């Protein structure tokens, strides 16, 4: 281009009317603050052909959360199945656009631009929420995790900068909207927070499950990617996570009100190097078991023996990241089952 005298922006010239038209349209979209979302450093705007506000409102609510009046889970599922919502006047075949813009020096760069029917977008979003579905504590106020809450699971909430990685946030938004694979950085950031805090929240467990359902890996098979505890699973990493949860339950029962458990000291090493750590945990378990009364002792011993029967005599020396994900899900599922049982007993 330079040989023709085209330098800087002149190597891709834009006509005056075209420049006016797209900047005026973009400014109009950005002025509607209710339908503009910021994900990391990416500003996301969406619109439908025909410009009816209901498409923008529904699209933003489905993708980012917001609980707009008149929008329900049933509406989302109907559109995902290609069925119209006559009461809302929404056509699933209406062309719909999503634009993600990010700053680039003194300019803007297009992080992603998606065009599809509105129904196809709703199917991608609905599929994402179904992958994310996992048993949750009763105190959680969300029935599903909106994008902003999902990204919050990847950051240290005690740090000064609570913003997620901009590139990861944009890639995650694009994956959900397009139905593509989740970025590896989403899983890595989630696992990093679990290891740093030794705490598996509902959101983090949901991310692990959704990630490996969309990005399959033999070390974290489908049998462990269930909504609730899969007692029939013989997966070693998943079973080790379950075993760790029961060991912790025995310790808490033997020492009511303790401030720290084996999770605070051994969780990370147990997930990464089980062959080295589980013999130590078993010795602690024997000491804790002796403090329990007869009925409690039998109850926990049966669970431990059943899990050890699945595992056999030898444990893995090291586990991959995917196996650690299966371990985390096993621990989470087993722990949630214990808490659910306690709540049911308290409500009787």
Question: Which positions does each model-derived feature cover?
Answer:
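Extended alpha-helical scaffolding segments
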Residues: 1-348
């Amino acid at each position: 281009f330079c040989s023709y005298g085209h330098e800087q922006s002149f190597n891709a010239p834009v006509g005056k009317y075209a420049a006016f038209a797209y900047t005026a349209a973009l400014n109009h979209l950005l002025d509607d603050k209710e339908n503009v979302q910021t994900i990391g450093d990416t500003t996301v705007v969406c619109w439908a052909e025909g410009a009816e506000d209901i498409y923008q409102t529904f699209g933003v609510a489905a993708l980012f959360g917001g609980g707009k009046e008149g929008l329900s889970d049933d509406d989302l599922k109907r559109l995902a199945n290609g069925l119209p919502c006559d009461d809302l006047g929404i056509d699933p075949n209406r062309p719909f656009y999503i634009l993600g813009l990010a700053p680039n020096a003194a300019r803007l760069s297009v992080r992603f631009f998606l065009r599809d029917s509105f129904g196809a977008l709703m199917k991608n979003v609905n599929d994402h929420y179904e992958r994310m579905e996992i048993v949750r504590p009763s105190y959680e106020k969300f029935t599903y995790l909106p994008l902003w809450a999902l990204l919050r699971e990847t950051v240290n909430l005690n740090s000064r900068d609570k913003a997620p990685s901009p590139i990861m946030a944009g890639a995650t938004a694009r994956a959900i909207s397009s139905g593509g694979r989740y970025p590896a950085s989403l899983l890595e950031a989630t696992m990093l927070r679990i290891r740093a805090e030794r705490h598996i929240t509902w959101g983090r467990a949901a991310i692990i499950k959704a990630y490996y359902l969309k990005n399959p890996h033999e070390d974290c098979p489908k049998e462990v990617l269930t909504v609730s505890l899969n007692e029939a699973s013989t997966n070693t990493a998943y079973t080790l996570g379950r075993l760790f949860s029961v060991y912790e339950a025995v310790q808490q029962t033997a020492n009511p009100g303790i401030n720290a458990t084996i999770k605070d000291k051994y969780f990370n090493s147990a997930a990464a190097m089980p062959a080295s750590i589980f013999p130590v945990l078993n010795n602690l378990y024997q000491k804790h078991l002796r403090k329990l009364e007869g009925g409690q002792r039998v109850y926990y011993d049966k669970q431990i023996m059943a899990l050890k029967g699945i595992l056999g005599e030898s444990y893995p020396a090291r586990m991959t990241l995917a196996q650690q994900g299966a371990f985390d899900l096993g621990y989470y599922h087993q722990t949630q089952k214990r808490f659910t049982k306690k709540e049911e007993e308290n409500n009787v």
